[in-house]
């Protein structure tokens, strides 16, 4: 009898009992960031979601303001220039392999230059003054072009530390006198200024033993500069107020055999002088100056 009851129980209730489903384990999550911006946004979002509930209460007002304030503080710190940074100048100008191009950007002063700058092009701006401090720490310069500015003053010694400087252009400015020039200069251009003879010292060019090209046209010179170096090849003095030349201007009156072998070109047109009256002044030259003879 008991055996029949047990069999009946198994037949009636076993089909109703089902095995428990297998436990599903969460698969690991993988985050793939397509780019840096997306990654940054995800990280910020995670930080926001991990804030305490009382901080996120009232939604965007508290947390967003805080986030923006913190972001602004970080931006201010990162943008604040340090003493040695070159970023401001190279954002304003173009810096490329030792060359700095600051042309036609209306700057009014020489910008701080990156160290190791060799070539500076700052043409057609509004620079009025060159100070000693502008190049105090930049001794690697080889070429400077300040053409087309408004330069009226150059402090004494502004170029004194530029011992490697070979080319300097101050053309189309408002200079009335010349600064002391660095010793290795090969090319100097001061065309179209307001320079008078008293604005050039007697020995301004004497020690420039590498100077080959000297451009002083369209100024207010009354005479040819003295003590021109033997290295000179091209001399432009056109359109000044030169009225006289003596026998020692280009030659040596006490040495009739002296010849200026390197001088190839002298331009003196546009001056109130008849060159034919001073033929002895050109006896050492291989070619006569360009200008009015009769």
Swiss-Prot record:
Subcellular location per the Swiss-Prot or TrEMBL entry: Secreted, Extracellular space, Extracellular matrix
PROSITE patterns tied to this protein: LRR
Positions bearing carbohydrate: 61, 241, 254
Lipid biosynthesis as UniProt keyword: no
LRR repeats, residue ranges: 108-127, 128-151, 152-175, 176-195, 196-221, 222-242, 243-273
Function according to Swiss-Prot or TrEMBL: Induces bone formation in conjunction with TGF-beta-1 or TGF-beta-2.
Protein name: Mimecan
Gene source species: Gallus gallus (Chicken)
The organism's taxonomic lineage, starting at the top: Eukaryota, Metazoa, Chordata, Craniata, Vertebrata
Gene transcribed to yield this protein: OGN
């Amino acid at each position: 009898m008991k055996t029949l009851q047990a069999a009946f129980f198994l037949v009636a209730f076993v089909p109703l009992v089902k095995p428990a489903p297998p436990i599903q384990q969460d698969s690991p999550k993988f985050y793939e960031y397509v780019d840096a911006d997306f990654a940054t946004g995800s990280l910020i979002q995670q930080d926001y979601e991990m804030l305490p509930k009382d901080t996120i209460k009232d939604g965007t007002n508290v947390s967003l303001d805080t986030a923006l304030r913190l972001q602004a503080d970080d931006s201010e710190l990162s943008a604040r220039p340090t003493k040695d940074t070159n970023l401001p100048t190279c954002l304003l100008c173009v810096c490329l392999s030792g060359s700095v191009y600051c042309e036609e950007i209306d700057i009014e002063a020489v910008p701080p230059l990156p160290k190791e700058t060799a070539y500076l092009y700052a043409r057609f701006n509004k620079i009025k003054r060159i100070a000693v401090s502008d190049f105090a720490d930049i001794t690697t310069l080889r070429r400077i072009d300040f053409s087309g500015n408004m330069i009226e003053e150059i402090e004494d010694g502004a170029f004194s530390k530029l011992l490697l400087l070979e080319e300097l252009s101050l053309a189309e400015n408002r200079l009335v006198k010349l600064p002391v020039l660095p010793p290795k200069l090969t090319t100097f251009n001061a065309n179209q200024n307001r320079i008078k003879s008293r604005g050039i010292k007697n020995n301004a060019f004497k020690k420039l033993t590498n100077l080959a090209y000297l451009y002083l046209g369209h100024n207010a010179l009354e005479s040819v500069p003295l003590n021109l170096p033997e290295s000179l090849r091209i001399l432009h003095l056109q359109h000044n107020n030169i009225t006289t030349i003596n026998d020692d201007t280009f030659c040596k009156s006490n040495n009739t055999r002296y010849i200026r072998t390197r001088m190839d070109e002298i331009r003196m047109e546009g001056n109130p002088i008849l060159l034919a009256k001073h033929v002895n002044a050109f006896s050492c030259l291989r070619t006569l100056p360009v200008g009015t003879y009769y």
